[in-house]
C-alpha cells in the first residue's frame, strides 16, 4: 500500500513497519504507551528511533486507537483511523490499517476445562511445571499456550525436552535466559538482564559498551551506519555475566554466543581469554567484555 497505519509499536508492529517502509510505503505507527518497543531500554531503542525518523516514519505515542471506517470505493477507497492523543481525537486517512496489538490466547472452546487441566491466574494460559507437565496426568503443554515468552525457539526447546521425557529421560526446562531478537532496522538482541533490571534486583554491576563503528567486519557490512553497539552487564564482585544487549545490522547472528555465555555462567574473563577470529562481528562481544574489565583496546 502507498500508506499504512500500524496500531501497536511493539516488536511485531515495528518489524513490519520497517519492512513496509523499505518497500516504499508511508508508515505511521500509533502506540498507546510512552515509548515504542517498551520491552527494551532507551539506549537500545535509540538507533532504531533514529532510523525511523530518517526514513520519515511518523510515530504517535500515548495514542489510543478508537476505531476505523472505510470511505469511498474503488481506486479512491481509503480507511480513516480514529485515535485519541493528548485528550484530542485525531483522524488518519490511509490505504490500509495493520493491527498488531490485542493478541489473546485461543484457549477457549477446546475442551481443556473438561480434562482437569489447570490454567494460570489470568485464566488464559495453561499452568505447567519445569517439565511442561500440566495438572492432568500424561498431558504436556509447550509454547505459546503455556505463556510468555511466546517465542518459536522456546516452544521448540520445550518440545524437544518433552519428547525426551516421554522417552524415559530425566529432563527439566531450566533456562537461565531465552534470547529475544527484534528484526527491525537495525536489529536488536537482548539476553538476560539489562542494566536497569539488574540494579532493580539489587545487583551491583559493571557495564561495558563497544561501538560497531570500531569493528572491521561491521564496517564492511556498513553496520556502523546504524550507530549500533554491543553492551555487557556483569556482576561487579565476581564478574559473572548477567546480560548482553546489542543493536545494529546483523547482530542477530551474535545471539548464539550471547546466550551460550549466560547459560554456562561465563565470567568476563572467560570471554576475554577466548580468541575471536578477525575480522568478524563476534569481536564486538569480546571488545565489550574487555571494556567492562577496563582493558579496552579499540575504544576509549
Q: Which residues does each PLM region occupy?
A:
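Rossmann-like dinucleotide-binding cores of NAD(P)H-dependent redox enzymes
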Residues: 2-5, 11-90, 149-156, 164-197
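Conserved phosphate-binding and hydrolysis motifs of nucleotide-dependent enzymes
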Residues: 8-13, 102, 143, 243
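Short, acidic, Ser/Thr-enriched surface-loop or helix-capping motifs
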Residues: 54, 86, 121, 128-130, ...
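Short, surface-exposed charged micro-motifs
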Residues: 67, 116, 131, 231-233
Amino acid at each position: 500500500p502507498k500508506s499504512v497505519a500500524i496500531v501497536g509499536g511493539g516488536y511485531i508492529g515495528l518489524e513490519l513497519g520497517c519492512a513496509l517502509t523499505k518497500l516504499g510505503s508511508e508508515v505511521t505507527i500509533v502506540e498507546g504507551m510512552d515509548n515504542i518497543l517498551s520491552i527494551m531500554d532507551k539506549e537500545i531503542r535509540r538507533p532504531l528511533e533514529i532510523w525511523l525518523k530518517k526514513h520519515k516514519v511518523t510515530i504517535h505515542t500515548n495514542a489510543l486507537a478508537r476505531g476505523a471506517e472505510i470511505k469511498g470505493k474503488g481506486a479512491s477507497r481509503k480507511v480513516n483511523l480514529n485515535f485519541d492523543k493528548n485528550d484530542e481525537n485525531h483522524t488518519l486517512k490511509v490505504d490500509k490499517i495493520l493491527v498488531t496489538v490485542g493478541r489473546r490466547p485461543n484457549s477457549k472452546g477446546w475442551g481443556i476445562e473438561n480434562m482437569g487441566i489447570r490454567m494460570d491466574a489470568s485464566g488464559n494460559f495453561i499452568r505447567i511445571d519445569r517439565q511442561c507437565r500440566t495438572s492432568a496426568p500424561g498431558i504436556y503443554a509447550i509454547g505459546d499456550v503455556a505463556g510468555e515468552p511466546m517465542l518459536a525457539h522456546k516452544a521448540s526447546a520445550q518440545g524437544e525436552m518433552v519428547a525426551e521425557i516421554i522417552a524415559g529421560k530425566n529432563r527439566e526446562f531450566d533456562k537461565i535466559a531465552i534470547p529475544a531478537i527484534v528484526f527491525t532496522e537495525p536489529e536488536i538482541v537482548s539476553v538476560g538482564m539489562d542494566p536497569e533490571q539488574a540494579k532493580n534486583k539489587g545487583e551491583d554491576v559493571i557495564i561495558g559498551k563497544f561501538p560497531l563503528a570500531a569493528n572491521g567486519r561491521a564496517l564492511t557490512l556498513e553496520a556502523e551506519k546504524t550507530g549500533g553497539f554491543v553492551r555487557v552487564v556483569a556482576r561487579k564482585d565476581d564478574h559473572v555475566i548477567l546480560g548482553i544487549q546489542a543493536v545494529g545490522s546483523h547482530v542477530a547472528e551474535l545471539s548464539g554466543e550471547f546466550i551460550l555465555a549466560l547459560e554456562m555462567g561465563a565470567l568476563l574473563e572467560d570471554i576475554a581469554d577466548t580468541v575471536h577470529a578477525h575480522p568478524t562481528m563476534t569481536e564486538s562481544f569480546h571488545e565489550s567484555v574487555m571494556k567492562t574489565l577496563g582493558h579496552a583496546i579499540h575504544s576509549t
